[in-house]
Amino acid sequence: MLLLAAVSAAVGLLFRFMIWAAVSPVSMVGAGESAAGGQAEAAVRTERSAAPQEAGLREDGLQPAQRPVIVIDAGHGGMDGGASSAEGVREKDINLAIARCLEAEAAQYPVEVIMTRTDDRGLYTDDARPIRAKKREDLQRRKELMEGETVTLGISIHLNSFPQDASVYGAQVFYPKEARTGTDVSQVCAQSKRYAESIQKRLETNISDGRERSAMAKSDILLFAQVQHPMVLVECGFLSNPDECVRLETPAYQQLLACAIWEGVNEILCLEKNKSVTVIDSANRG
C-alpha cells in the first residue's frame, strides 16, 4: 500500500508538471531568450564601447581635431583677373593652376585642405555694386576663411608684375609684419615668418633660377591685417618677365612651384606621406 501511494503521488507530481509546462511555454522560452538576449546585449555594448576609440580615427591614426588645417587661396578670380602679361596671360588662371597643384600635394598627407576657390570665380556677391566694393568683399571673405578657428596655416597664391623692368624675376614669399598697435600678434607673425622662410628656401633650392631672395614682412596687405593665424602670401613669379611668364604657364613648372611650397610647409609640420585628407571647397561649406 505504501508503495502504491508513493507511485500515485509521483504520477500526480508528473501530471502537474506537464500541465504547468503546457500552460506556461512562454516562461520557459522567455528564460532562454533572456539568456540569449543578455549575450546579444553584452555583444552590442562591447561594440559600442569600442566604437568611440575608432570612430574619430582615420587610417592615418590621427583624430580629426589633430590634423592640421591648411587653407589654400588662389588669388583673384571671376571679374578680377589680377595682373596680366603683355600677351594677355591672366594671373587668376595661373594662381588657380598652382593652387590646385598645391592641393594635390597636400592631399598626400594627413591634413584638412580648404580651398577658397576651385574654379574661375570670386568670393563676392554678384550684384550692382561698384567693382571696388566687390573686391573688398572678396578679400574679406578670403580672410575669414584663412582666419578660421581651427586653421593651422593660410597660403595665398599670387603672381607679380613689374612692367617698368621686365628683367625682374623670381618667387617671393611674404608674411605679416607685427603691428605696432592693436592686437598683439607677435607669436602669429613669428610662426608666419618661420613658414615663409622655409618656403622661400625650398623655392630657391627646387627652382634654382639663380635668384636669391629672403622672405619679407609686409603690413600693407589686407589679408595680413590683425592676423590671428599663421599666414603667408607667395608671389610665384613675374608675368612681366617674358621668359618667366612662359614658365609660369607650363604645368610642369606649376607643379614644381607647388612641390616647393608644400615641402617648405611640411618642414615645419613634419608629417608623414601617404595618409588621409579631407578637401573642402569653400562653395560647399554652407
List the model feature ranges, each with a label.
Residues 163-164, 211-286:
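Active-site-adjacent mobile loop/cap segments within catalytic or ligand-binding domains
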Residues 20-71, 277-286:
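N-terminal, intrinsically disordered, polar/charged segments of Gram-positive cell-envelope systems
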Residues 144-163, 204-205, 209, 218-228:
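Active-site-adjacent loop/helix surface patches within enzyme catalytic domains
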Residues 100-111, 147-151, 159, 200-208, ...:
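Sec-exported extracytoplasmic/periplasmic mature domains
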Residues 111-118, 156-158, 207-216, 272-279:
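Surface-exposed patches in mature extracellular/periplasmic domains of secreted proteins
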Residues 188-217:
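Active-site-adjacent substrate-binding region
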Residues 2-19:
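Hydrophobic membrane-insertion alpha-helices, especially the h-region
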Residues 51-194:
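Catalytic-core regions of hydrolytic enzymes
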